Amino acid sequence: MEGAEEKKKKVPAVPETLKKKRKNFAELKIKRLRKKFAQKMLRKARRKLIYEKAKHYHKEYRQMYRTEIRMARMARKAGNFYVPAEPKLAFVIRIRGINGVSPKVRKVLQLLRLRQIFNGTFVKLNKASINMLRIVEPYIAWGYPNLKSVNELIYKRGYGKINKKRIALTDNALIARSLGKYGIICMEDLIHEIYTVGKRFKEANNFLWPFKLSSPRGGMKKKTTHFVEGGDAGNREDQINRLIRRMN
């Protein structure tokens, strides 16, 4: 009996340092699990918010379209012509090289971020930007993009400027990190801000890298001739959407 008791006494106790390590490890594991759970809940809440926003925007776009149709019908009924509101958004595509052009033209193309042939950018239309477009009109094709064009360009060709690098917009988190402070956290927010020319259009547009479009299917007709004369250059109004389809 005495020998057995002596053996029991001789069993080495767990060192305090090991106990402390185990306790710290257990606490760390709990913290990690809590953080993981919190992140999961945050992702779930964000997905729900993005879904609700997309639903709201869809309703808003449908309402805008219906209002246009109703106004046109009312004008026809009264025997008048319906004149839509002045477009606020343009999509501009560079279609020619600039060898031998004036420094002014070169500078305007740089300001429009059209450094290469078949680069495209969104432009907010106002007096100053329209004057800029007139200066470089022989070198660009431009017009008024519809919702489908804005949507397809951003989803298919959209790249963001993140840390001065061209990054594909494959995840809403990339948008949220760069534009979250402006309330733009997903692709639908970005599309809405561009299409409606919202208060944060400048930030949203500067975030988007200039679009690199393909050579148009079927080729160009006459790059040096204006669109109204059967060429490719200049303002083609809503016909820009056809060109976007051929190049996207």
From Swiss-Prot:
Gene Ontology molecular function: any one: structural constituent of ribosome
Keywords carried by this UniProt record: Acetylation, Cytoplasm, Phosphoprotein, Repeat, Ribonucleoprotein, Ribosomal protein, RNA-binding
Residues modified to N6-acetyllysine: K124
Name of the protein in question: Large ribosomal subunit protein uL30
Residues bearing the modification N6-succinyllysine: K127
Phosphotyrosine PTM sites in chain numbering: Y139
Subunit structure: Component of the large ribosomal subunit. Homodimer. Interacts with DHX33.
Compartment list: Cytoplasm
Sequence repeat windows: 7-18, 19-30, 31-42, 43-54
